[in-house]
Amino acid sequence: MKLITNKQGLVGAITVPGDKSMSHRSIMFGAIAEGKTVIRHFLRADDCLGTIKAFKALGVKIEETDEEIIVHGTGFDGLKQADGPLDIGNSGTTIRLMMGILAGRDFDTVILGDESIAKRPMNRVMLPLQQMGAKMHGKDGSEFAPITITGKQSLKRMEYHMPVASAQVKSAIIFAALQAEGETIIHEKEKTRDHTEHMIRQFGGEIEMDGLTIRVKGGQKFTGQEMTVPGDVSSAAFFIVAGLITPGSEIELTHVGLNPTRTGIFDVVKQMGGSLVVKDSSRSTGKLAGTVVVKTSKLKGTEIDGDIIPRLIDEIPVIALLATQAEGTTIIKDAAELKVKETNRIDAVATELNKMGADITPTEDGLIIHGKTPLHAANVTSYGDHRIGMMLQIAALLVEEGDVELERPEAVSVSYPTFFEDIRSLLK
């Protein structure tokens, strides 16, 4: 696919699609709650539609209208054995959180996914769940999907110190803890996104959060809710960077989620001298959201490491692109988690942007980016990773001559089916 190139002046306002993390969880909590849950501004992209499909297979009635998703909750105990394996496609969130949800059920389940899922590490979820009494294993006894879960296991409380900073692992343990006897205590390594914790409260449950320590009691019941999912800050990030690096641009992004565990990119943009303003922030059905305005800016290199990394882990590919247009060197470290995403994002970012003229050195846990470098035409690939594909389209906007051909552009539909249309809507 030929990408859009040689564009100046991205001007206008868009509303990015609903938050992917929250869309997944809204279906999950709607299913394990009792009564009806109504979800608006749900992300209708491949990953989240896969979560709907999985819960339908588990016997949950889910209706889809143009405006809403309506989940008729069954409670944990109302989930039924699927007729066959649950195929969750490309969604790491779905497989890992479902492992926690299904660990305490009284039926057996097999969960599988695409070739990318089959390469992603699952011991980080399986080991703590096994410690709680769950019985599960990967293919041929490995840690890789398909994952087989044996039902009718009695889950017990535990105290767990997380070896990695991962919201997916934390959430899987929380879902299992809700079905366990007693109180489970989780100690996070670093603060990660906390949508699961907030949704427990939104759906009428109880959870204690004190710094990096989380306490959750088993045996809780949830009640269906009405909710509006805010725009995904990870999707907004591509337009934030486009507005900062494309000459003559000013972009307004409306109804963007502003959960502080997700807004690390705002801090980095300001560190680099970028013009980013948040206005009209408000709480819509308990979720903080607002309008983000960015303008073309002169940028300088910076260092990105430590506890900010979990707050922007999914944005690092497009932050790396931003750094190619900043004066000086940008160093990103403590981000080894990027190697076990949909692809090895450290290598993918360096390889593809270097093809276009960037000066990026991959490291064991991050990237060293020397700016400012002009970008030129090249043939590039998404590696089947939605965030790499979208980042390369933003990079292509700066290419003045020739074509940028993207292999596997369809990956973008995992999280942002209307991405290319929204880019075109901002062109003068």
UniProtKB/Swiss-Prot annotation:
It is an enzyme of class 2 (transferase). GO terms for biological process: amino acid biosynthetic process; aromatic amino acid family biosynthetic process; chorismate biosynthetic process. Phosphoenolpyruvate binds at residues 20, 92, 120, 168, 345, 387. Its EC number is 2.5.1.19. The active site is at 314 (proton acceptor). It comes from the Bacteria. It is found in: Cytoplasm. Keywords: Amino-acid biosynthesis, Aromatic amino acid biosynthesis, Cytoplasm, Transferase. 3-phosphoshikimate binds at residues 20-21, 25, 166, 168, 314, 341. Its main location: cytoplasm. The keyword Acyltransferase does not apply. Coiled coil: none annotated. GO terms for molecular function: 3-phosphoshikimate 1-carboxyvinyltransferase activity. It catalyses: 3-phosphoshikimate + phosphoenolpyruvate = 5-O-(1-carboxyvinyl)-3-phosphoshikimate + phosphate. GO terms for cellular component: cytoplasm. Pathway: Metabolic intermediate biosynthesis; chorismate biosynthesis; chorismate from D-erythrose 4-phosphate and phosphoenolpyruvate: step 6/7. InterPro entries: Enolpyruvate_Tfrase_dom, Enolpyruvate_Tfrase_sf, EPSP_synthase, EPSP_synthase_CS, RNA3'P_cycl/enolpyr_Trfase_a/b. Pfam families: EPSP_synthase. Catalyzes the transfer of the enolpyruvyl moiety of phosphoenolpyruvate (PEP) to the 5-hydroxyl of shikimate-3-phosphate (S3P) to produce enolpyruvyl shikimate-3-phosphate and inorganic phosphate. Monomer. Belongs to the EPSP synthase family. NCBIfam families: aroA. HAMAP family: EPSP_synth (MF_00210). This is 3-phosphoshikimate 1-carboxyvinyltransferase. It comes from Listeria monocytogenes serovar 1/2a (strain ATCC BAA-679 / EGD-e).
